[in-house]
Curated annotation (Swiss-Prot):
Name of the coding gene: hemL
GO cellular component: cytoplasm
Domain of life, per lineage: Bacteria
Assembly description: Homodimer.
Alphabetized GO MF terms: glutamate-1-semialdehyde 2,1-aminomutase activity; pyridoxal phosphate binding; transaminase activity
Main location: cytoplasm
Record-given protein name: Glutamate-1-semialdehyde 2,1-aminomutase
EC number: 5.4.3.8
């Protein structure tokens, strides 16, 4: 079966042929490759072609595909039961690993997706603050719950407008949209809605408008505003937690959040996410408090076992993030040099094992900046790299990831492919 045939078959039964829209290659053109299996740093499609994978399941696989330790933990757990629907010491073990690492987190609760984590964190934050207003930032993605699917309408101080079909305006009326890395836009919302804002949520390292880190000064001023107006600050680290560093984004800004959300890496590739923070807020959750949150598969033993194996392996390797960042910098430096040689302007960014690039002549600080990137050039580059066996994120507004299964030789392979690709698309 060819990739085209497999994708055509998928479209008969699955909307758009995919279970998450970006996988359909809509923004880069062509049809997606259909994956048969994966191992280490590589994907293999149904036609037998091999790809160096810089997506790594959109971030979770920090050790690459089929890591032996995580694989063995999952297999062992399956033999003891895939789900109990009851408490298990494995939940406590993973919770302790995370709380011990992140000192601002007193307690944590597990869920099955990043969307659940952010949705639940916002609910308990509102329950604690007793105010409904929520500030989010343009370009930050916090999952697909209704209240967070908004874009800027007539400015940062107005109510948000739904940016997805099926989202009633009443659902987003308490969501206010601010500009990333622009503290004045946040001040204006607080000043104009002094008694309404109970929650602020932000990706400290945004990964869904490309890779765009928040400035240290901006985050510190955001913390001060939340304290001044009595709002709960949530740092969404579903992507950056245990990815940008062992402490997520914290070493880059040293700002303490009230709540933090996690996902991806903490599950070792399984469907695990979490939200945690100060005990006085987390104790508002049922059964101790009045804020209800639940999940059939939350904390299931297979996922917990994978997470324990992943975090334990991270903690046992003091040089892990040094190696990963070195490879990420080598890749982005290689892309810059290759683009320069072809007369193409590119901006790059690295945070630990995360990387991103924009085809623009200015530094990207927010969503409007990101939108000015040359997405047509990005699409051509993606197609040219895919043809050469390099699997990059099929959207300008996503982030790439390095895994520990990659070697310097793998990075050299990608850089050499980029040299050829840039010359091809420039011709």
């Amino acid at each position: 079966m060819t990739n085209k045939e497999a994708f055509s078959e998928a479209k008969k039964y699955i909307p758009g042929g995919v279970n998450s829209p970006v996988r359909a290659f809509g923004s880069v053109g062509g049809e997606p490759v259909m994956i048969d299996h994966a191992r280490g740093a590589y994907l293999y499609d149904v036609e037998g072609k091999k790809y160096l994978d810089f997506i790594q399941s959109w971030g979770p696989l920090i050790f690459g595909h089929c890591d032996k330790d995580i694989e063995e933990a999952i297999i062992s757990a399956v033999k003891q039961g895939v789900s109990y629907g009851a408490p298990s010491p494995k939940e406590t073990a993973l919770a302790k690993l995370i709380c011990d690492e992140f000192k601002q987190i007193d307690k944590i609760r597990f869920v099955s997706s990043g969307t659940e984590a952010t949705m639940s964190a916002i609910r308990v934050a509102r329950g604690y603050a007793k105010k409904d207003g929520l500030i989010k930032f343009e370009g930050c993605y916090h999952g697909h719950s209704d209240a967070l699917l908004i874009k800027a309408g007539s400015g940062a101080t107005t109510y948000g407008n739904a940016s997805s079909g099926g989202v009633p305006q009443d659902v987003v009326k308490n969501t206010f949209l601010a500009i990333y890395n622009d503290i004045e836009s946040v001040k204006a919302i607080f000043e104009n809605n002094k008694d309404k804002i109970g929650v602020v949520i932000i990706e400290p390292i945004a990964g869904n408008m490309g890779l765009v880190p928040a400035d240290k000064k901006f985050l510190r001023e955001l913390r001060e505003l939340c304290d001044k107006f009595g709002a709960v600050l949530i740092l969404d680290e579903v992507m950056s937690g245990f990815r940008a560093s062992r402490l997520g984004s914290y070493p880059f800004h040293e700002v303490d959040a009230d709540l933090v959300t996690f996902g991806k890496v903490i599950g070792g590739g399984m469907n695990v996410a979490a939200f945690g923070g100060k005990a006085k807020i987390m104790d508002c959750l049922s059964p101790e408090g009045a804020v209800y949150q639940a999940g059939t598969l939350s904390g299931n033993p297979v996922a917990m076992s994978a997470g324990i194996a992943a975090i334990s392996k991270i903690n046992s390797d003091v040089n892990l993030y040094v190696r990963l960042e070195k490879l990420a910098l080598k890749l982005m430096d290689g892309f810059k040099e290759a683009a320069k040689s072809a007369g193409i302007t590119i901006q790059t960014e690295v945070r630990g094992s995360m990387f991103g690039y924009f085809f623009t002549d200015h530094v990207v600080k927010n969503y409007d900046d990101a939108l000015k990137s040359d997405t047509k050039l990005f699409a051509k580059f993606h197609q040219a790299m895919l043809k050469r066996g390099i699997y990059l994120a099929p959207s300008q507004f996503e982030t790439g990831f390095i895994c520990d299964a990659m070697s310097e030789a793998d990075i050299d392979l990608a850089v050499n492919a980029a040299k050829e690709a840039f010359l091809e698309i420039k011709a």
